[in-house]
Each structure stands twice: as C-alpha cells, then as structure tokens.
Regions:
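C-terminal regulatory/interaction module of P-loop NTP-utilizing enzymes
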Residues: 1-291
C-alpha cells in the first residue's frame, strides 16, 4: 500500500499500519522530526483514495481552532437584516443564526463528517506541541468519535475516520491516550533503506553519489549534533547535488551545500571544517572497501 505511493516502509511499520486499519484503531507514531511520520498519512490517504484532513497542533490550540466556531460576522449581519425587516421573533432569529449555515467546521469536526460516504484519513500532527487539556478533549473524541455542539446537538461520525497521530516526543503524551492507539516508533532508516529512498525520490542522482550521500548522512547521525538530518534533508541534499551536476562528493561541494542538510549554525560550523573532511574520507574509504 505504502510502496504504491513511493513510500518505503519497514516491515514492522507496514504491519502495524495494516493492523490499525483492520482493527479500526488510531495509529500513534512517535519519532524524531524528519523521519517521515507525516508522509505516512499523506501516502495512506492517496493510496486509499480518501480525503486527508490535517490538524496541525501547536501551543495554545483551542476548541475554536480545532473543532468548530461560529461565523460571527455573518451572524451579526443576519441579526441586523432581521431587525431592519422588522422581525421580532427572537427564537426564530436564534434558530436561524445557530444553524449549519453559520457553522465553521474545523479539522476535528471535518473528520467526523464524510458527506461522500468515505471516511477521511485524519492526521493529528505533532500532538506533543499541545497541552494536557487538549489531550483530554481528544481522548473523549477518539472514544466515541462524536462532538457535541450545544446549539445543534451531538454530531457523530457515520464511519470513524482513519486516525494517525504523530509526535516528536518533545514531551510525554498521557498513557490514557496512547492506550486507545496502536503504537509504533519511527526510527531513522537503515543505510540500505535510505539508499532505496534516494533511488526512488531522486532518480537522477547517480549510484556513486547516492551511496556517498547516504553513508555521509548515516555517519552524521552518530555525532552529537543539535539536530540530526532527517530523511527529508537527505532527499534535499541529493536533489541539490544533482542540480549542481555533481557526480561525487568532495570537500568543497559538501561545504557549499551543508545548508540543505543541517539547519543549525553550530552544527554547520562544526562539520564545515576538519571534522567534515575526516567524515568524507571515512565515507569514501568505507565504500571503497565494500566495493
């Protein structure tokens, strides 16, 4: 399924995703930023021909931004028009302005509504950026797949969405929420898997350069960097090198393109020098030894 969408998944990930679909349980994906957690939901939605609804989490995320809110300007306009026309029936005005016509559906409510009959893939991205109060609310939603709008009543999902939750583990998410889900830790890919990813995503990158790129990135991840390069950065670096018509790595090229691979100046300053050259020598020696 994922391979059809050009996503190379480890067997353990493919298995837990299959079980999540069959058991109709949310899938909780945890791992470092840049390992491809978000991409899983995108590829899954495309493979199943389902709409993708994404709730991007952030500090301070509230119900109005995540679930629903009322279109207050339109409601006020309707009230003014009613007053201008001489309408005095307050109950009728209230029923009108608190109807579906003025309801703005945010991602949670969108995920519970499938007008075309196809339950969407609901991506709750970077849940660890929110607070415990929002976690508690989300736990309630995932328990029954329903939301109560006081003015309209309870809105239930005719078919529960396929839920993918991701976190970068900047803080621990409450156990109660995790227990509702199937869990999988998404790690950086092994060298062979990352090489295959480059072959698929950057087909113009020649084999020698692809192997050097992967070996270099794999070695970088063993260092105590502020932020290790993810798979997305590996792809970006291979793409940049290809656009520069490079066929192999050399110290000058590595120095010129580090900004596509590393995103913090302290990391760049450390690698852009003797340590980076030593790393490149080790890569070339290692690849030469393995043929």
């Amino acid at each position: 399924m994922l391979s059809a969408g050009n996503y190379l998944a480890a067997r353990s990930l493919a298995t837990v995703l299959f079980l999540s679909l069959r058991m109709k349980r949310p899938l909780f994906l945890e791992g470092e930023a840049g390992v491809g957690k978000t991409e899983i939901a995108k590829v899954l939605a495309a493979s199943l021909d389902r709409p993708l609804i994404r709730l991007q989490c952030y500090e301070g995320l509230d119900i109005a931004s995540a679930v629903y809110e009322w279109n207050y300007p339109a409601q006020m306009l309707e009230i003014r028009l009613a007053e201008a026309s001489g309408t005095t029936d307050r109950g009728r005005i209230e029923a009108d302005i608190f109807s579906e016509r003025y309801l703005i559906r945010r991602p949670v409510l969108q995920a519970l509504s499938s007008p075309d009959g196809r339950a969407p893939v609901f991506l709750i991205d970077e849940l660890d950026r929110t607070d415990e109060a929002f976690e508690a609310f989300l736990l309630e939603v995932l328990s029954d797949f329903q939301v109560t709008v006081p003015e309209l009543g309870t809105i239930r999902a005719a078919e529960p969405p396929i839920v993918i939750i991701t976190t970068n583990r900047t803080r621990e998410v409450h156990d109660a929420l995790k227990r509702r889900c199937l869990y999988h830790w998404v790690d950086y890919p092994a060298a062979a898997q990352e090489l295959e990813i480059i072959r698929r995503k950057v087909p113009r990158c020649n084999e020698v350069l692809s192997r050097q790129v992967v070996a270099y990135v794999q070695k970088l991840r063993t260092l105590d960097l502020f932020k290790n390069p993810g798979v997305a950065e590996t792809i970006d670096w291979a793409t940049a090198l290809t656009e520069l018509d490079r066929v192999a790595l050399d110290p000058e090229t590595v120095s010129d393109t580090l900004g596509t691979l590393l995103k913090y100046q302290d990391d760049i300053a450390r690698i852009d020098g003797a340590e980076g050259r030593k790393l490149l020598d080790e890569v070339k020696t290692g690849l030469a030894a393995t043929g």
